[in-house]
Amino acid sequence: MIGISGDSNQSLKAYGVNYEQIDLIDNEFDEESIVERLQQKNVKLVEIQRSRGYSQRLSLTIDKIESIIHKIREVNQEVIIMVDNCYGELVETKEPGDIGADIVVGSLMKNLGGGIAPTGGYVAGKKDLVYEVAQRLTAPGIGKDLGANFNLNNAFFKGVFMAPNAVKNALKTAIFTSYMLETVSYTHLRAHETP
């Protein structure tokens, strides 16, 4: 956790990590503000959240993410670009790692775990960055070699195997439900019009 005040000596804020959020404007990246921050501040990492989370915005398409990654690279070649890909796995033909993201993170309890994995997450991307994340998430010297625990490998493997079909069926159901709700004048979930 970043931490609000830095009072905890274990928060990221206590380690000197600062955070600044640039909100979307009408579901589009605020390119002007992003470029301005990248030019004015010592930015080490840009994080992009693909899913809508609990907000009412649309999830970001891979094309929108690719476009902003190119814009970020025009301004700063060295910044690390991380995409939180929760709920974004397997919904389009490309993934964030295919379009220039340095590191991609997500949950195994959602799309990639096929709804079967009871816990867990994943980190994928450039080898040196995955190594750094593994060292921080577990323990220095153990890193990625710790692996899954609690006898959950069976659920993880089943989840990853079932994920493509589970995601496909979830998308079909969401599109169908959205269309049906719109026919009764409930227009808040217009997924059937989303690419």
Where do the protein language model's features map onto the residues?
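Hydrophobic alpha-helical bundle architecture
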Residues: 184-186
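Conserved PLP-enzyme active-site core in the AAT-like
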Residues: 1-168, 172, 178-181
